Amino acid sequence: MQKKLDCLRLKTWFLAEKRDLPWRQTTDPYAIWISEVMLPQTQVAVVIPYFLNWMQRFPTIRHLAAASLDEVIKTWEGLGYYSRARYLHEGAKELVARFDGELPRHEELLKKIKGLGPYTIGAILSFAFHQKKAAVDGNVIRVLTRYFGLEEDIAKPATVNQLRHLAQSLLPDEEPWIINEALIELGATICQRKARCHAC
């Protein structure tokens, strides 16, 4: 029998211990999109002021689309990975042209937007629209492979796809987005690269 995830225990832990992060205080799809593009390979403490400044400078998709690329790059300056800023700018223009400046609620439509990959799409659908959709980033991959004792090579796309299916199967019908956030939080704070198993 496959090992099961104790969603209630995980949810209880998360609600008690979660970090107070600005993008967790909103269900605005645009704000969540920006945070999820900024966060990979970047420390949360570094991202917070950039996120707050970005949202003040470009409060909506339309504001971002109307800005010049130079202004967008200058606002992003210091975060690195400048292609992300360009993709955000191009994506915003596309959203204005095709979806009236709104992020759509449907996965197939989100896939059409340049720069949106499986994780970011899952995060938007889950955290903004509260859909039952897994959001599998590096933190979640680490948690699942350790918890379920998986030894497959996570560098292989087939393994990542398998983990996405596993994560999807673990989500409860009630408040599934909290389990997504909890798995990410667990990987970011306890189940880190250097495991803190004693704290889990």
Enumerate the predicted regions with their spans.
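Catalytic cores of DNA base-excision repair glycosylases
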Residues: 2-198
